[in-house]
Amino acid sequence: MSTPRPEEHQKFSAAAALCPLSNCQFSGVVISAIADEQKLEFTNKYKGSCTLLCSYDSQGIVLRIVLDADREHVLKEYMIAADTDAAQMGRRSYAVTLESDNLVLRFASDQDQQLFRKVVENVKHLRPKSVFSQRTEESSASQYFQFYGYLSQQQNMMQDYVRTSTYQRAILGNAVDFQDKIVLDVGAGSGILSFFAVQAGAAKVYAIEASNMAQYAQQLVESNNVQHKISVIPGKIEEIELPEKVDVIISEPMGYMLYNERMLETYLHARKWLKPNGKMYPTHGDLHIAPFSDESLYSEQYNKANFWYQSAFHGVDLTTLHKEGMKEYFRQPIVDTFDIRICMAKSVRHVCDFLNDKEDDLHLIDIPLEFQILQTGICHGLAFWFDVEFSGSSQNVWLSTSPTAPLTHWYQVRCLLPMPIFIKQGQTLTGRVLLEANRRQSYDVTIDLHIEGTLISSSNTLDLKNPYFRYTGAPVQAPPGTSTQSPSEQYWTQVDTQGSRNSSSMLNGGLGVNGIGDGSMDITHGLMHPH
């Protein structure tokens, strides 16, 4: 291992102590290939000594080999995993089988060999599978961390003004909870929340990030000169070790419908590092559920499925797949936004208490429903949104994804019924929503609705992992039939009002048509929000 500058040594030592799978490098390594296993004959693998670059990966350690004389070009890349064969050879050498290559690594010092051996052993002989690994398919975890390793995806979240500004306001508005405190940032991503904690006066922030975004977070920490405040630790919170308990945990663990991606379980798991009476930001989440009526949305999905009802598509009969096509389209939750007036009853609220709920509580979430119907119509399904609260010592701050609040990158979610039900004002709609966690970091969502006092019911099971992103950016339209005045008369009344305001400009030479001045008219409110 090359002799590091004092600050580099400090960084590596801290990382090694906190997370054995952290990034590290070893220089001056001579790599030999085993030419004959029986005679133990070796040949030099590369001309000249090499540097081994080790970096954390969700599946183990990525080992990249470069020449000491040319670190720009990677000669070979391997994955050190739990099934990697390896053994110590003397005080400075280490034998390892990577893919089909049998290698002997001779290190520059005894210490380097010991450190590398610890890195390998921490992958090979780790503790049993972490809670995260037990509940998550390998392919799902790989895709998940790859997705959040892109700067573009971090940018998408950071540019959500409502999200980012609300977090900053909640943290800075409760500086007393952060001043001189130890903070844990779970799933830190770019580290933006860690920076907010430092702005609020935090003494130390441990920023945990399992994707490759950790390296970018480290760059931001160093370029902003806060490396003495923020320690970026690559890894999963379920697998890393911290040197101390923390006063506050911050995170942005919410997914679509609050629970998607199952990051909330990771957030709750992090409480093992929280001191008694410590703070959680956010503190609790409310999932809101309401029946809705939207003939346009239902018809859109139904007509898509009818593609498979063609009996002569280029001479081919597709009708045998119509039933499966219909099932697939209606298994998709719809991610978009809507006018809250499509909701037929006041929403039911299901609370998740981040300070007290257990991880297991989120494996099967059974939510009883009872709605007093406020308007007669056809119920096409259930609409979902969530609010989270930051309960601070100085003030409480809410982040809302309600259709009545400014739009966020979470939008809202709607689950359709394949068989809608007609229901009258004053009737009671009962049922349940069952969220059953799966190993794809999501949930199977079952909705079951029944009109009390009748035999009328409808149900559906949807795959929250496979939503339909319907949002187009177009303004939300008011539901049909909500105008209580003539929209035409409303328009012309507003035109007349604007015309009066612009009369002075016409007298000063402004052009007018039919008595309307050339001044700008704002008719959006009248069209989009009729009274």
Swiss-Prot record:
Domain annotation SAM-dependent MTase PRMT-type: ranges: 141-450
Any GO MF annotation of the entry: histone H3R17 methyltransferase activity
EC number(s) stated in the UniProt entry for this protein: 2.1.1.319
Pfam families: PrmA, PRMT_C
Gene3D superfamilies per UniProt: Hnrnp arginine n-methyltransferase1, Pleckstrin-homology domain (PH domain)/Phosphotyrosine-binding domain (PTB), Vaccinia Virus protein VP39
Subcellular location: Cytoplasm; Nucleus
UniProt entry tagged with the keyword Transcription regulation: yes
CDD domains per record: AdoMet_MTases
Catalytic activity as recorded in UniProt: L-arginyl-[protein] + 2 S-adenosyl-L-methionine = N(omega),N(omega)-dimethyl-L-arginyl-[protein] + 2 S-adenosyl-L-homocysteine + 2 H(+)
Biological process according to GO: chromatin remodeling; peptidyl-arginine methylation, to asymmetrical-dimethyl arginine; positive regulation of ecdysone receptor signaling pathway; positive regulation of transcription by RNA polymerase II; regulation of DNA-templated transcription
Sequence positions bearing Asymmetric dimethylarginine: 501
Residues at which S-adenosyl-L-methionine binds: 154, 163, 187, 209, 238, 266
Principal EC category: transferase
Reported modifications of this chain: The dimethylated protein is the major form.
Family membership: Belongs to the class I-like SAM-binding methyltransferase superfamily. Protein arginine N-methyltransferase family.
Subunit structure as annotated in this protein's UniProt entry: Homodimer.
Annotated protein name in UniProt: Histone-arginine methyltransferase CARMER
Gene from which the chain derives: Art4
